[in-house]
């Protein structure tokens, strides 16, 4: 993943090419921490909003994942989910994802980081973490990945049937 440091935020966003983004790179702890920091910078955030909105309008639609997608980026999306799980489950899932690369990682440190990020994201002035009023709450604490996806697909299918 290219880092466009030193650029004006608008110029850096214009140079981004989503075709070059490696999805696996987006799921790292470093990107997770950086995303929260970047999201609190008004100038960077404003530049990213338009980029994300344009991405969402691609032919065929798009599925976007983020803490302000339903409230700021795509407030008029046909279907929105507010996906959550208990802190313990979120940390365990993250641990499973990251422990292969980081042998010093602990569940306790991940819970602490999750709490800190959630608090920072809820309290930030720019695009705070909120559940959109019309978002479907999807608590995945007791659900497998397959069950979570099936529930989301079922909800989307119902919404499509109702809109046609």
Predicted regions span which residues?
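ATP-dependent small-molecule kinase phosphotransfer cores
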Residues: 1-61, 88, 100, 111-122, ...
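Short, well-ordered beta-strand core segments
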Residues: 62, 78-82, 135-137
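Conserved nucleotide-binding/hydrolysis micro-motifs of P-loop NTPases
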Residues: 69-70, 85-92, 142-145
């Amino acid at each position: 993943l290219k880092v466009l440091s030193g650029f004006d935020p608008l110029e850096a966003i214009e140079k981004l090419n989503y075709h070059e983004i490696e999805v696996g790179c987006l799921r790292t702890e470093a990107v997770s921490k950086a995303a929260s920091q970047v999201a609190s910078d008004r100038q960077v955030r404003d530049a990213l909003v338009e980029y994300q909105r344009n991405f969402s309008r691609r032919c065929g639609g798009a599925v976007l994942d983020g803490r302000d997608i339903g409230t700021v980026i795509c407030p008029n999306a046909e279907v929105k989910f507010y996906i959550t799980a208990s802190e313990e489950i979120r940390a365990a899932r993250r641990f499973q994802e990251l422990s292969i690369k980081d042998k010093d990682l602990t569940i306790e440190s991940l819970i602490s980081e999750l709490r800190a990020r959630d608090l920072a994201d809820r309290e930030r002035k720019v695009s705070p973490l909120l559940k959109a009023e019309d978002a479907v709450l999807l608590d995945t604490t007791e659900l497998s990945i397959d069950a979570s996806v099936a529930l989301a697909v079922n909800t989307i299918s119902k919404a499509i049937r109702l809109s046609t």
